[in-house]
Amino acid sequence: MLKLRFKRKYLSIPYFIFLICFVLLPLLLIIYYALSNENGTISLDNFVEFFSNKNKIGLLSVSIIIGALNTALCILIGYPVAMLLTKNKKGNNKISIMILLFIMPMWINFVLRTAATRDLLYWLGINGGNYPYLATMIGMVYNYLPFTILPLYSQMLKMDKSLIEASYDLGANKVQTFFKTQIPLTMPGIISGAMMVFMPTMSSFVISDVMGERKIQLIGNTIQFNFDQMRWHEGSFIALVMLIIIGISMLLTRNVKTEPNARGGLW
């Protein structure tokens, strides 16, 4: 038995090698480039240049706003859809078809489905040239909505339905039960979906390029431009700023995710 455990321990070696080579080392390189100048010496020039540039601060602010707006829209649309899916009886083919319809676009290339969405909006009279922000937001919601529905659906399946019934037995109406019992119980799914949408939205550049016809510049577009121009230090610092923002967001939501039942209740 001891010999078997000894062998199993080494099965994780390829995993740790992969993490070191493709996660840790690239992250360390980004930090190094972000905190150094073109001569390779440690410097805060990138810090000063970024935070003294009003255009870049504006791009970061717009990216955060669009990320938050897209996250809110995805949750507002995805929550009732997830509720509808969980209320269907087991073995119902309709629920399987609906889940398949939400998952199928994820099987298609990201750029191709974004371009198809752009062409559909053209046909409806909404083009990125005249309505860049509207077209971009539609593209964002379309691409990231499944990432909200799936964790919400999973959380609602695990939710203790007896607590909902207890809320009604204690005299709560549907609105009170929804906001004071169901929402707290599904908060881990809401947070998971929000993080899965907010993080890629902030760093996205393909959707804004394709849907907005390059009339919208987000912080992801700035990072892409810097790396295309071989400006590794400036691009790495902006990427590091985004990593810090995302890390702060994850820390703020950590307690909510680890205590799903502690916040539920009628009062």
Q: Where is each model-derived feature located?
A:
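The alpha-helix within a helix-turn-helix
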Residues: 167
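Membrane-water interface segments at the C-terminal ends of transmembrane alpha-helices
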Residues: 7-38, 54-131, 136-157, 185, ...
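Short glycine/proline-centered loop/turn elements that form peptide/ligand docking sites
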Residues: 159-163, 261-262
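Short, Lys/Arg-rich, polar N-terminal cytosolic tail immediately upstream
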Residues: 1-6
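Glycine-rich helix-loop "coupling/hinge" segments at transmembrane-helix boundaries
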Residues: 36-39, 205-232, 266-267
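A short amphipathic helical element positioned immediately N-terminal to and/or at the very start
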Residues: 42-51
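Short cytosolic juxtamembrane segments of multi-pass membrane proteins
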Residues: 90, 256-267
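Glycine/proline-centered hinge or cleavage motifs at structural transition points of membrane proteins
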Residues: 170-171, 184
